[in-house]
Swiss-Prot record:
Organism annotation: Haloferax volcanii (strain ATCC 29605 / DSM 3757 / JCM 8879 / NBRC 14742 / NCIMB 2012 / VKM B-1768 / DS2)
Lineage: Archaea, Methanobacteriati, Methanobacteriota, Stenosarchaea group, Halobacteria
Protein role: Catalyzes the formation of N(4)-acetylcytidine (ac(4)C) at the wobble position of tRNA(Met), by using acetyl-CoA as an acetyl donor and ATP (or GTP).
Limits of the N-acetyltransferase domain: 418-603
GO BP field: rRNA acetylation involved in maturation of SSU-rRNA; tRNA acetylation; tRNA wobble cytosine modification
Primary gene name: tmcA
Protein name: tRNA(Met) cytidine acetyltransferase TmcA
Reaction catalysis annotation: cytidine(34) in elongator tRNA(Met) + acetyl-CoA + ATP + H2O = N(4)-acetylcytidine(34) in elongator tRNA(Met) + ADP + phosphate + CoA + H(+)
Gene Ontology molecular function, alphabetical: 18S rRNA cytidine N-acetyltransferase activity; ATP binding; tRNA binding; tRNA N4-acetyltransferase activity
Nucleotide-binding listed as a keyword: yes
Length: 754
């Protein structure tokens, strides 16, 4: 520790670290800990010592009045894709892990990241607006812990390349010198000979590294139908730029290229690079990157289409480029295979989050598709040299490099060999390997895991983590959120439309489904559940859910879950004792899926909650399927209805039975009394074991009777030769339903046609 007296020479320290950063083309981190006003003054000294022009400096702070470019912490995402020489992050008031990751990603090689913090000894005990967001009802901010900040502080104190000044004591705790670090400049790009490339020479000349030029070469496979290219990279490696160069090259040849991503912002770099290349080639004819629609010579085009529409749009295009593919669900990724040629580009580890799930969740399906698959990976950073200590610190501090155990260590795990255990935040902090394995599995359980998720896991009072371990290695995890147990004022606020954080199921039950008592029972919602990919489909997920049921039987009224509905997931949760109580009436913007809510009672209060919502669901679902859910996938509807823990009686009048019998066994028409067919169809679909219908017949009931699709559309979708054939098939499908549910009057009517 170096004594600096009453006036620490931050200027000299910043100058030294800046000189080192420039010499290695890496970044350095300077922490100014202590009084906030003193920290801001010291940050100005750091800017002066680093000799950075004002227009290359950004302050990320809630404070105003600086001569530098300023960004509010809640808008830190605006720095993604930008490059700054020096960024100051004020962590005193509105600090979040997400903001830290996004800010760090904006610092260029040779630059400095300056972090203003409270005293490092006191910081973990401080609470700010982020902690207030973690304090979801019925908890208060006093229940939020400071474990995440405590872990962050420990990394600041021992990671290479981090200079640390204690402003309160006037000392340099660490000077951050990192001269022993090895810096490697990326290999220069390679330009293939004309006979070895399809893309223009200029596209290769625009590449910045050999990795990028090799990725562009791999993307040339998109010129041929029946191909797929997978491009993976950590953030900052030029993946999106390579995709943009490929898209621009295709457009210059007159190709129609569809680009999709979770949002337009995610695809901005693809369009910027495509526009620049087309301009350099003299082939730009209209539109632009800002419009996300670029016109080129010979009818070429690069255009953005939202993920839920991209599969259909790409089927008529020449190629589809998917950026940030890991942030999209498997169902959408599969729909993209309708394109003649498709590129899946994804960030494996990035400052804004991690997305390794693409490889685990989708790669097997891609390999099984009738595609010639080309792989490319970019490892060399674009904006700074390899071995950058700020990158390695950020990955470590935010667990962006967390991974599950290697396959060999868990491949022989079975439900009989595993142990169930609670993973408390203190357990996780005491064992870095345990933390990395558990968090690594949680990353794979979701399309996009943010740095804030780590802070929530360690500090949020409503979250709890459970796991199955095999010989000490984590093979399955479940993250649960405690919900409900709300006081009357909170329940009334929710009923009146107020949004209550962290209580998803009670919120939907109360505000949307008008059940003011739904916030009284205590439930645990399974937010994420994941099993190691090496031992999937071996019963471990079900074993974990059984353990959860047994553990929480005396502490909660129900277990619940909400997810993007697919037939497979609905069946999985049904097999584990969960019943459908609601289907959302709007699709998720990113996944294109409708959400299903399911519960499993643990007490009489939980059973009452389940029973009334199951019955209300059955009372409305027939109408909703013919309206807001008229485009719900038929197999999702079948699985959702089969999972309802209640049976619907058809309750037909004698006249209605005569109509149904006449349409199934005789010459009658379905259109005479569609309501009777709807009730009988719902009775079967909520208890499909009672009568034997084929999956195709059940889809016919869903599409025509429940969703009222036109006959010609139904016949086409279900591969009937004609509408008349579909009509006859519907009558045939109702024969076993008449046999199973029919009254004496129905059976008597049936005998007239035998």
């Amino acid at each position: 520790m170096t004594e600096l007296g009453d006036d620490p020479d931050v200027e000299a320290l910043a100058a030294a670290r800046r000189e080192e950063a420039l010499a290695t083309n890496q970044r350095r981190l300077l922490v100014l800990a202590g009084d906030r006003d003193a920290g801001i003054d010291a940050a100005f000294d750091a800017v002066r010592g680093a000799d950075v022009p004002d227009d290359e400096v950004t302050f990320v702070t809630a404070r105003e009045g600086f001569r530098f470019h300023r960004v509010e912490p809640k808008r830190a995402s605006s720095l993604l894709g930008t490059t700054r020489t020096l960024v100051v992050l004020d962590a005193h008031e509105e600090f979040s892990a997400n903001a830290l990751g996004r800010v760090a990603g904006a610092v260029d090689g040779g630059g400095l990241l300056v972090l203003l913090t409270p005293s490092l000894d006191d910081w973990p005990t401080r609470r700010d607006s982020f902690d207030e967001r973690l304090a979801v009802p019925p908890f208060s901010v006093a229940d939020v812990t400071g474990r995440f900040r405590g872990r962050l502080v420990s990394t600041l104190r021992d990671h290479p390349g981090v200079a640390l000044v204690d402003l309160d004591s006037g000392t340099v705790e660490r000077d951050g010198a990192y001269r022993q670090g090895i810096s490697f400049d990326a290999a220069p790009p390679r330009v293939p000979t004309e006979k070895d490339r399809r893309s223009p020479r200029r596209a290769y000349e625009d590449c910045l590294t050999a990795d990028q030029s090799e990725a562009l070469a791999a993307l040339e496979a998109l010129t041929e139908p029946g191909t797929a290219v997978v491009v993976e990279a950590d953030r900052g490696r030029g993946k999106s730029s390579a995709a943009g160069l490929a898209a621009g090259s295709l457009a210059a040849e007159g190709k129609d290229v569809v680009v999709t991503a979770p949002g337009e912002r995610n695809a901005a770099e693809v369009f910027a690079r495509a526009e620049r290349l087309l301009s350099e080639l003299g082939a730009l004819r209209g539109g632009g990157a800002g419009d996300f629609d670029i016109a080129a010579d010979r009818g070429g085009r690069v255009r953005y289409v939202p993920p839920t529409e991209a599969g259909d749009a790409a089927a008529d295009a020449d190629a589809l480029v998917v950026d940030e593919a890991a942030a999209l669900p498997v169902g959408l990724l599969e729909s993209f295979l309708a394109a003649p040629a498709v590129a899946f580009c994804t960030t494996v580890r990035g400052y804004e989050g991690a997305g390794r799930g693409f490889t685990v969740r989708f790669r097997d399906r891609l390999d099984d598709a009738d595609r010639e698959v080309t792989d490319a990976r970019l490892d060399d950073p674009i904006r700074y040299a390899a071995g950058d200590p700020v990158e390695s610190w950020t990955f470590r501090a935010l667990l962006l490099d967390a991974r599950p155990p290697v396959d060999q260590l868990v491949a022989d795990a079975t439900p009989e060999t595993v142990s169930y255990r609670a993973l408390s935040p203190d357990d996780l902090l005491a064992d870095e390997h345990l933390l990395r394995e558990a968090f690594g599995l949680l990353v794979l359980a979701h399309y996009r895991t943010e740095p804030d998720d780590l802070a929530r896991l360690l500090d949020a009072p409503n979250l709890t983590l459970r796991a199955l371990t095999h010989e000490g290695r984590v093979v399955s995890v479940a993250l649960l959120a405690r919900e409900g147990g709300l006081d009357p004022d909170t329940r009334r606020q929710m009923y009146d439309g107020g949004r209550i954080r962290g209580n998803m199921l009670p919120d939907v039950f109360t505000s949307q489904l008008r059940d003011e008592g739904a916030g009284v029972p205590v439930g645990y919602r399974v937010m994420r559940i994941a099993t190691h990919h090496a031992v999937r489909s071996s019963g471990l997920g079900s074993r974990l859910l059984t353990e959860l049921r047994d553990e929480f039987a005396d502490d909660a009224d129900y277990l619940g879950v909400g997810f993007g509905a697919t037939p497979e997931l609905l069946s999985f949760w049904r097999d584990n004792g969960y019943g459908t109580v609601h289907l959302s009436t709007t699709r998720n913007d990113t996944s294109g899926e409708y959400s299903a809510l399911m519960t499993r009672p643990l007490s009489s209060a939980g059973r009452d909650l389940r029973d009334r919502h199951a019955n209300w669901f059955l009372g409305r679902v027939g109408d909703v399927l013919g309206d807001a859910l008229s485009d719900l996938d038929a197999d999702v509807a079948r699985a959702a209805l089969a999972a309802v823990d209640s049976f619907l009686s058809p309750d037909l009048s004698e006249y209605e039975w005569r109509v149904v019998v006449g349409a199934s066994y005789g010459p009658g028409l379905y259109t005479t009394a569609p309501g009777a067919f709807r009730r009988l169809g719902l009775a079967h679909l909520t208890n499909p074991e009672r009568a034997s219908l084929t999956p195709r017949e059940e889809r016919l009931v869903v599409r025509k009777v429940l969703q009222t699709h036109p006959w010609d559309a139904v016949a086409d979708e279900l591969d009937f030769h004609s509408t008349a054939g579909a009509m006859r098939a519907l009558g045939d499908a109702y024969e076993p339903l008449v046999d199973e549910y029919g009254t004496d009057a129905a059976r008597e009517e049936r005998e007239r046609f035998r």
